[in-house]
């Protein structure tokens, strides 16, 4: 099994030059403030598919912003059973859930080649005291995590597999759109098995629903490539507008 990757300071793109800055950072940060934030950010080599960023039980000392690629977070039961808790795309922060107990309650693993920015939490906390805009941004991120947890509980309460998978696809679509990518044509970095684990469905059920969606011309799917053909109907099946 691969060990968690330790990142080191590395001379790469400044935060202000990153295409994800509008999503990742408060818009009100000036150049001097952004320099101060960039000073504490560590950027290391990309994680390979299957490599761990951190493991459940590891000490909490940093949060991470996904720069490219995708991560899954999951917890292991006492019997070793994996339960996926989320999929994380570029500009999203990972690791904040470890702040309370000072250890990570989940593991984070790369679904594909993935680059992250590591932000040591103590230094981030100190900087947030000096920059109220940054503190508010962190609070927004934590609020979003709470909202995502609530949406997940709502998702798992839906009666049908069709509703769960429609909601999952509409949510991904909104997140890709927010990042400047196509909302209707994208690649799934996660496997059908991982989708099923996340949604509480058997992998056979996931495959059947994807097939049914294609037969009903809601989507076209080939391998991990998905093309949403009827976003209005898919959104209606998901129960309305779903934000990323």
Curated annotation (Swiss-Prot):
Keywords: Activator, DNA-binding, Iron, Transcription, Transcription regulation
A molecular function GO annotation: DNA binding
Cellular component, GO annotation: cytosol
Keyword Transcription regulation tagged: yes
HTH crp-type domain sequence ranges: 159-232
Binding-site list for a nucleoside 3',5'-cyclic phosphate: 21-149
PROSITE patterns the UniProt entry points to: CNMP_BINDING_3, HTH_CRP_1, HTH_CRP_2
Xref: InterPro entries: cNMP-bd_dom, cNMP-bd_dom_sf, Env_Response_Regulators, HTH_CRP, RmlC-like_jellyroll, Tscrpt_reg_HTH_Crp-type_CS, WH-like_DNA-bd_sf, WH_DNA-bd_sf
SUPFAM superfamilies listed in its UniProt record: cAMP-binding domain-like, Winged helix' DNA-binding domain
Result of knocking out the encoding gene: Nearly complete loss of expression of hcnA.
Signal peptide per UniProt: none
DNA-binding region: 192-211
Domain of life according to the entry: Bacteria
Induction: Up-regulated by Fe(3+) levels in oxygen-limiting conditions.
Function: Transcriptional activator of anaerobic gene expression. Regulates the expression of the components of the hydrogen cyanide synthase (HcnABC) in a positive manner. May also act as an iron sensor.
Misc note: Possesses 4 cysteines which may bind a metal ion (possibly iron).
Record-linked NCBIfam families: PRK11161.1
Protein name: Transcriptional activator protein Anr
The organism of origin for this protein: Pseudomonas protegens (strain DSM 19095 / LMG 27888 / CFBP 6595 / CHA0)
Organism taxonomic ancestry: Bacteria, Pseudomonadati, Pseudomonadota, Gammaproteobacteria, Pseudomonadales
